[in-house]
Amino acid sequence: MALKDLVQDVHTKAENQPFAKLLMSGDINPTQYATYLFNQEEAYRALEAQADKHGILNDIPEIRRADKIKEDFKACRFMRVMRPEKDHVRVLPSVRRYYNYVNEGLTEKQCWAHIYVRHFGDMYGGNMISKRIKFMKHQMYAFDRKKELIEHVRSKLSDDMV
């Protein structure tokens, strides 16, 4: 059975979470989206730092998302959708738990599994999200060499990663 099929139940559960539905609806407001971006950057920075410890992104640097997410977050602030003195963005508890978990150390195999879920989720789902959220451009969902990235990451996956 393919890894995609093995994680389908978890994927379906994630898609049915209230925030995921809000994100996909296009009804998310800019402040909510900025909070989302801020938290995504935290998660991606942690994961990409662990991946760097294993050197696994050296051949595919364009898969990195943290800096692109940061640029999107800055764009939200530039649009004045957030007022720094009033709109304090915070790391959500679930993201803090993920950050702590990742920073405890991931094996190379675990890094690939997390990259598959996070980066591919944004690669595929991001196309739909960016069409629905029209108040800004979305750097985080723009992947160069998409076909090559997909092939490279898939070559590192195995069914025992579930």
Model-predicted regions and their roles:
Residues 1-162:
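Metal- and O2-centered redox machinery and metal/ROS homeostasis
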